[in-house]
Amino acid sequence: SRLKKEEINENKITLRVPSDIKKIYKLFKKNRKQLYIVGGAVRDAILGKSPKDFDLATDAKPDEVLKIAKQGGMKTYEVGKQFGVVVVGGHEIATFRKDIGKGRRPKAVDFSDIQGDVNRRDLTINSLFYDIEKNEVVDLTGGLQDLKNKIVKTVGVAKQRFDEDPLRKLRALRFQAVIGGKMDKDTEIALLKNPSLKGVSRERIREEFIKGIEKGKNSKLFMEALDKFGFTKQMFPQLKLQKPYPNVKSFILFLATILRKNDVKKLPSILNNLKYSNEEIRNITFLVHLKNFKPEKIYDFKKLQEKTTLKKQTIINYGKLIGKDFSKITNFNLSVTGGGPAFVGLKGKQIGDKIKELEKLNFLNESVINEVEPKFQSVHTTSSFEQTFGGWYSKYVPLSTKFMQKMIGKERV
């Protein structure tokens, strides 16, 4: 009928299917087996994004998938075969299935049809299948309309979906952030009634948090949603969270901003327990540590900065988020090497202390020069101190009004 034709047309989307997947599809079709692109790739295509990863689903059993792939001379990996998943040509192909048991790793799977496979998925917007030949979406849950209306809704009964796997609670909020949408009423009620993340690994919590910050449309709204449903205290135990939350795409900047009121000495161990990497911890703690900066500590701070992978602009941007100007600290370069007349007779710790003292003077002088440059263009006299130490003095101790007055008395700069 005309109505049916219009409904089918509404399901047509543009999805650029990679040539290797087209090859796999032809092999399956030749063997009279179904093969669909599923999940994230379909969702992203509808949102106008270019999918990076393609997952496939089929009615063929794992052994049949291996046999078909062998016919086409394609490389296969059987990792996950017991759960109905086989890798062919770098793409995961999962047999339609029902999961038996709770959690991310079900005890077993029961092979099913496409309807059964759809019913086991978490959200309607993630339950869309793409028919490669017809160039249209197969939608058995209303997910296409939910995606167009920017609504996050579970497949089936929300409580049941969340009880099966509590991680789905965070995924629901993450996808709400990604599409910039709102929560379905029943889904929201289920979250409010049972916000517990018990049984969810810290690694998965970290992963969902980072994706929500960096892939969501607004990190501030994402964090406020986590607050609303009672997740932040579970995700960041022992930590004080500073509000208002910022809207930034970098989770490093985000965490450094909201954690800046915490004891920087305790942060590394806490973040380590929350499964953040050593690199992430160094970057976050360095930024938080900047609140304790004093000129006499410039040497120590620059050494800490060297151990991070932070770009200069990232540090400057962090300063802007908390109302500070870190550009002078960031752009300052250590230059004292520990040689020259100033170090004659010094040993061990004395040398280190002298280096730090001179670097502090360098830093302070750069600051003064930046501030008074319009008034003071150059040095007009040569002091006896400068004559004595010559080039070393010019290289390691740039002139500042305060320093020179102390060292050479009445001579004018």
List where the protein language model places each region.
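Catalytic cores of the polymerase beta-like nucleotidyltransferase superfamily
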Residues: L3-N370
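Intrinsically disordered, compositionally biased, charge-dense segments
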Residues: S1-N11, E357-V413
